[in-house]
Amino acid sequence: MTMMTATQALSVNPATGQTLAAMPWANAQEIEHALSLAASGFKKWKLTSVAQRAQTLRDIGQALRAHAEEMAQCITREMGKPIKQARAEVTKSAALCDWYAEHGPAMLNPEPTLVENQQAVIEYRPLGVILAIMPWNFPLWQVLRGAVPILLAGNSYLLKHAPNVTGCAQMIARILTEAGTPAGVYGWVNANNEGVSQMINDPRIAAVTVTGSVRAGAAIGAQAGAALKKCVLELGGSDPFIVLNDADLELAVKAAVAGRYQNTGQVCAAAKRFIVEEGIAQAFTDRFVAAAAALKMGDPLVEENDLGPMARFDLRDELHQQVQASVAEGARLLLGGEKIAGEGNYYAATVLADVTPDMTAFRQELFGPVAAITVAKYAEHALALANDSEFGLSATIFTADDTLAAEMAARLECGGVFINGYSASDARVAFGGVKKSGFGRELSHFGLHEFCNVQTVWKNRV
């Protein structure tokens, strides 16, 4: 089942297969209206004080809390996220608004330089209308983690959301309007690929931010580059989760299961390749399989369920093909490996063992509830295996040796390293990757400055 046709985007409940809504693609005139509104909104918004913008963020956070259950239910219905996790996404998004409202203004203060007598400073100015192309897996968080700092910097934000979460896109826009966000400062348009190209090439778009697949990011990045538009790309990941012999086994297994199966495995920065030192490999594998088997799968609106359906039917088919290919290549299937028969787009929690670097499960991103376990001979071997990937988003190390962990972190080719804990995005730290995981950073002051005109102001230079 596709989530789009030539004429419209389809919102389909993956737990039932029921079509929730069909929304026509925006035509050229509607896209022109969205661009015009965003451009006029920017002209006014950039003149507001940072304090005013920060208050708007606080108001957005409050509005999100007021509509928390409604928003969570929409997320769960449209993309299948277990309801407890959907509620947590709303809570995290509201907290993001508060964090930037409190800490962001200071990050926009003029920055001193080493020029004598403070004659030169760096100013962070608004850039313009930012086009955001966002995915379905965190339909609220992914939008706001870019939009909140973009708005605080004085830019306007124009969203093109994933076609299977148009209900979430509409609700986000409604909540921000209710919070008092001025017209044109935040907008969204249901654009298809041609519409996206129209917007990227329009001179009113100053920059583009994309979270999505490598293929989509490369295509959009190429268009943005041809138009000389700045672009931030947050793309795929096949993150290594290293477990060394001296690791706290119970803690490592708990983090591994949470890190792999949250959001039914549909997380770009999730642990996907479990690289375990051979002295602890069997014990880790046994406990991991038992813990994964104990996860409850079913209706994502039922509180007790840990795993819901995969969001898209085509991606379940692709994942199953990757699992089958890996088994044919020699991987050992320890758990799952099958589509769940009946209503809904469910895929069993799956564990593959004896995975080697030449196999599909090691080389490709597995975007679903599938874990691949690879045995490393020693720590240096584990490090080499971790870096043997075209991706470089995040990595995890479990060890009792803090010195070794720090040394390994310095040599891991990725944007984030988590020691004795699984990866996550957090407003307080930068998020992003290297290699084919993309470039640029979101969150913290890095995400705030990404879409600023970093302007040098130098007085009395002779």
Where are these regions (language model features)?
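Short loop/turn microsegments at loop-to-beta-strand junctions
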Residues: A6-A9, A271, L393
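Rossmann-like NAD(P) dinucleotide-binding subdomain of oxidoreductase/dehydrogenase enzymes
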Residues: N109-L251, A376
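Structural signal for hydrophobic packing residues in well-ordered secondary-structure cores
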Residues: F42, K46, G61-A68, A72, ...
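Short, well-ordered beta-strand elements within core beta-sheets of diverse protein domains
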Residues: T19-A26, G41-L47, A132, F241-L244, ...
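N-terminal Rossmann-like NAD(P)+-binding subdomain of aldehyde/semialdehyde dehydrogenases
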Residues: M1-Q118
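Residue-level signal for inorganic ion chemistry
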Residues: G17, R53, I75, C97, ...
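ALDH superfamily catalytic-core signature
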Residues: R215-T356, I419
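Conserved C-terminal structural/oligomerization subdomain of aldehyde/semialdehyde dehydrogenase
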Residues: N13-A22, I205, I242, K296-M297, ...
